[in-house]
């Protein structure tokens, strides 16, 4: 018979606490016999049980331009309006690369990094460990969570992964500050895996971009939000990880185009996109889908116009901050055409030619979004749960927390899509396509190769479960 929720009892169920808790004083006195882990967690883990838990964390922090350091340090005990959480997975975003390149100059940095380093990573998923008193009616320890990092607090750009000392995705444990909950940006995640939770944020960026599109009616000042239903849509440089998600969303969301053209200049990337999201799948949903390599086309604008029956496009998305691509997008917009500049540049002076004659006489307009909002991430989670979106196609590499610094700094030079990090693991960044070759000398990768081959070389719950169980701990 256990008469109190003492430290040793908790450690028996959660070994990670053995070396990481500094103060673990039980206040409540539940009396219970041996119970299943789930019941034990429910009895022990409410924050009222503890007078503060001081947790050690390992995290990658940014100190300045390309100055990323994997460090171990102690998190303070949480306050009544905070939540202690365990991060399991984080997917590396190009925005983190841009943050590392810009350092203090980045718009989301709120204080001098050399004196106030921030934990990087904002596409993360994990479990709640200790819930402050203020939030115990809404959240419980043991719940899985996803997060909407674009807080928009008081009109600022502050966000986890950019602006905070104790919260970011590339860490083992974090403290979720009050504003995340106050703004409705901590979301319960009910799936049986973690990697899809990490993908919900990048998916929400695409969802938000589609919702940000708008069109007008002559003689009216009302903006009709969204792409033109049944219209024509061009995704330029659109077969990277975010482009793949945009194709998936364009085909499967309720407001679809009638014609969708996707361009790139890399045959291998185009072939992978077409194999994952084939024109036959789009046709089932009433969308004509065409993939085009524009690399060797002398006049890509004319070719893309020809593919659209000689007409220009209602909606154009630009997925690369490249001047000729932006200008191609401008030239493709038809009457009342909306150009979405999706890819954020690192150069504050980045610019391109834009036809203002057409702004005046053809009602052209341009939009840009930086992340989705909370409704967008909820829509993403909902569509993913129903199987309407399958963003796992974005994942091409997996690795451990020890790989984050090099991966973020060199992200623009590493081919493929999303790099998925498991934060409690020490594991070289490895492409799924390379598992079989590495498996010739490493049984761990040999087994992973067999698992991903069963799912058409895509990451899966089975692969994640195997990695979490067998990959070396950090």
What are these regions (language model features)?
Residues 76-91, 105-151, 168:
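Glycine-rich beta-strand-centered segment in the early N-terminal region that forms part
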Residues 241-242:
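Hydrophobic/small residue at the entry helix of a nucleotide-binding pocket
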Residues 315-320, 334-349:
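ADP-ribose/adenylate-binding Rossmann-like module
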Residues 149-230:
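NAD(P)H dinucleotide-binding glycine-rich loop of Rossmann-like/cofactor-binding domains
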Residues 217, 223, 297-305, 311, ...:
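C-terminal hydrophobic helical "lid"/dimerization subdomain
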Residues 343-362:
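Rossmann-fold NAD(P)-binding glycine/threonine-rich loop
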Residues 230-231, 236, 247, 251-325, ...:
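Adenosine-nucleotide cofactor-binding segment
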Residues 37-54:
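Short, Lys/Arg-enriched N-terminal segments with co-localized hydrophobic residues
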